[in-house]
């Protein structure tokens, strides 16, 4: 035992016997069938320790998903960003959690601009789409304790499931579970489950949108494009390859009339997955469309995912492009153009720091590289 923190014993990570012990102990859980790890208090151990730990875990169980808690991290705080980018696992996105909670509680002004502020920092991360997002957890009052309105909770859940990141839902949130005693502070934020209602509006909403995440890669891999925003109304799209999702959220008590252009959705007639209302996009525009107060709308254009014996997700970070430029992959196989730049596989823009591509292969061994655009070149 090395130190004491918050009433808990901590250990000396410099001791190789401890490091070997903790790695072997967690590997036993993986062998028992555990398929993901949530790690506590990342920031109290050095980056090199987590690099060693995550390397050992992923070597033991390839494909393991890991994320950890860097308590109350913010994308404008460099130390937490360094952890997110260098420890080999994702982290909980406290910044976006705060943005969503401030948006609906009014604890800080700005409404949806609080959310947009956080998203504008996405390029500081190497894997923003892998940040684990949430709106409440065991270390803070539940959402309903600070915003006692189930309609607002439903709107927050729409954001949680359609914005970038991997959504993490606190138990009971889908049942409107809450105990506001003492402002919902610990231990009142951890009540026993009172309901298992699979017909509640919140349960069905979450079920619908999580099903959409499985079907539409724009939500798991795509870029974010804001088409309209003010304090009370938010219209954005998520886009990846030929897939797209459009989301409209109105947290005002009053209806909002939408007049928006440059919406990155294919033109066509859609049906909202939440309300069942029709939505028509023409020339990238939505004009004179009424969105009721305290409601959200989600429409989806589901493209064709890449299918092949082997599907590889490529990602490039750290290369900033200019408008009109793109990044592509070339390699020694048919799928990557046999080193011919004219036949290279073009990647998808996610943010200033991230380009992604899903490529299907008919074989499992290949050589590849990622060419950079030249000045004045369009590809």
Residue spans for each PLM region:
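Chitinase-like catalytic core of GlcNAc-active glycosidases
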Residues: 1-31
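Solvent-exposed beta-strand/loop surfaces of large extracellular or lumenal domains
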Residues: 273-285, 340-345
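Aromatic-rich carbohydrate-binding modules that target alpha-glucans
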Residues: 319-364, 374, 379
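Active-site-proximal helices and loops of the catalytic beta/alpha 8
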Residues: 24-27, 35-127, 131, 148-150, ...
